[in-house]
Amino acid sequence: EGTAFLKNESAFRIHSPRQFSKVQNWLQTDVDITLTDWAQLTVIGRILLDPTGHLETNTHDFNAGPIDRAEASDFFQAELRELYLEVVYGDFDFRFGRQQVVWGESLGLRILDVINPQDFQEFILDDFIDARIPLWGTRIDYTFRDWVVEAVWFLDFEENRLADHGSEWQFRNSALPSTASATSAVPARIVSPKKPRDGNVRDSEFGFRLTRFLRNMDVSLNYFYSWTDFPVPFRRSLGMNDLRIEPRHKRSHLIGGTWNYAFNVFVIRGEGGINLGQHFVSNDPTNRDGITQRE
């Protein structure tokens, strides 16, 4: 069984410079292949064509896998969005492969919906289903009476994708530590980010979700141990004339929960979370690495 759709998204700047900022043509195919009564293979692929040549070109991680994403130029992209095998066995539901995992109840907000990194090539205008970057991993659901236990594990790492430098969607105010100090004002050199290793168990990400239906209300408790999707820009001084910004991804713990309550034709939703170990840029020039951490 398969479906496909064509879509065009075009935008024209009415102020200088008067030009098309994009004429983006999508072709996406979704194929579900039933292997047995208890196993199904899903493949989702997407091709983008933009004759204006405004597709982003340097925002992805080739090390994540050579079949994830291919580009011939800045007007053509082909991407394997999802490829996973789903197996249902008794009270267990297994999903192996490249996939999206969606947590949370909020509409238009990503409080707990942070399992997959996000594509910011058009800032936050894309629908989340298109903006999420699928990852290679495993999801397991176990149903026991009114309880559902979900576990996720990812050996694949990708960071958030930003728009190219010079794009109208570029983050203009990228937060970097102050490069001034009490004794020096040397311009800083930004080095390439240090990323977690794909396929390394010690660098993997994992999480759990416990869900229960209770008196017309669905409630959940969530936990996710992950890497920051944006690298933390640490400042490092190697001498009077050698000041560097060394971005590194750091570990974080997300703890939260959700609930939704249905009555008549109405549904009330709630969601909250706390991110432990989050890092923030410090404007204090006496701060050694330019970063403060929230415990």
Predicted region positions:
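Outer membrane beta-barrel
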Residues: 39-173, 215
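Transmembrane beta-strands of outer-membrane beta-barrel proteins
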Residues: 2-8, 41-43, 94, 149-151, ...
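Outer-membrane beta-barrel pore domains
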Residues: 69, 223-230, 234-295
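Outer-membrane beta-barrel pore domains and translocons
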Residues: 5-11, 46-48, 99-101, 154-156, ...
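Residues on the lipid-exposed face of transmembrane beta-strands in outer-membrane beta-barrel proteins
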Residues: 8, 27-33, 43, 82-87, ...
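Residues that define the transmembrane beta-barrel architecture of outer-membrane proteins
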Residues: 12, 19-27, 76-81, 88, ...
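Flexible, surface-exposed loop regions and adjacent strand-edge segments
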Residues: 21-23, 58-64, 111-117, 159, ...
